[in-house]
């Protein structure tokens, strides 16, 4: 018969971790909210407002992951304790080994719940807008911007998230000057917010006949899609609206009539554009959502800058700082914040970003997170 004291200690340790998470997640309040949302969704009138019904459905799904997840693990650990006692009384080694296998499963669940702690920010559960802006450097920089756009689209798709290209401005020879993509998925903004910053590419340029090494920069900005429950005060007098004909990359997904809309928020010089809707009205509505998201994120970063003097020294709060180097001719991609380094560069550019993003999230949590919305 194997030694059972370490198994019993493991049950106790896992139980303590789950009880700690129960407090961190405010389990009782979430359970009560889950019951409220479930009752609302059972009402025959709920689908009179389809948008609200869908939002409630998403909220229920996220609440269930926490509430049911914690309840199931606590129940399973109690059963494991009973089963271990039975194994001890009957000297049944097979049963004891089955308990160990169960504990491996529960530990994986606990680790997932602990990772979820990183998504405690007010807007972390929101969908996200990702803005990609090519830096100086002409065609090489614009090609780099398109490579990054593809990388994020592939990563989002690998997670089963929905993507929608809201605006794209084609490059003069190749690539793109800028693009905005909406990403809809569970904790999309929570996952993507660590990607804000400047991404640096070093490679032998395919656009250089002498095959020289070039350095290019692209800025990535991520903002949460703001729902109607969040107050964002936008004065219509502060807006300049331009209508234009869609152009550049985008193919069949971009409307070619003169219905594209560009809105400038004059006080902050924040510009958003949308060209994928079927009408000028639809594009304007989408652009206003994008503007609200951007202004929210800028306000969060402004507050962080005021809170932390180091943040205030950044050259451009809106775009953050250089976060990752992609040195392709040396097969090396390195995150400058976490030290994570990969040599399988094509796999990363094909959307294998989990290791980088998870490390950034964990580093942010360990540091207590400088974000005020966290």
Swiss-Prot record:
The lineage of its organism: Bacteria, Pseudomonadati, Pseudomonadota, Gammaproteobacteria, Lysobacterales. Its main location: cytoplasm. This is Peptide chain release factor 2. The keyword Protein biosynthesis applies. Keywords: Cytoplasm, Methylation, Protein biosynthesis. GO terms for cellular component: cytoplasm. Pfam families: PCRF (PF03462), RF-1 (PF00472). PROSITE patterns: RF_PROK_I (PS00745). It comes from Xanthomonas euvesicatoria pv. vesicatoria (strain 85-10) (Xanthomonas campestris pv. vesicatoria). Methylated by PrmC. Methylation increases the termination efficiency of RF2. Signal peptide: none annotated. The keyword Iron does not apply. Peptide chain release factor 2 directs the termination of translation in response to the peptide chain termination codons UGA and UAA. It comes from the Bacteria. The modification N5-methylglutamine is found at residue 252. Belongs to the prokaryotic/mitochondrial release factor family. It is found in: Cytoplasm. One of its GO terms (molecular function) is translation release factor activity, codon specific. InterPro entries: PCRF (IPR005139), Pep_chain_release_fac_I (IPR000352), Pep_chain_release_fac_I_sf (IPR045853), PrfB (IPR004374).
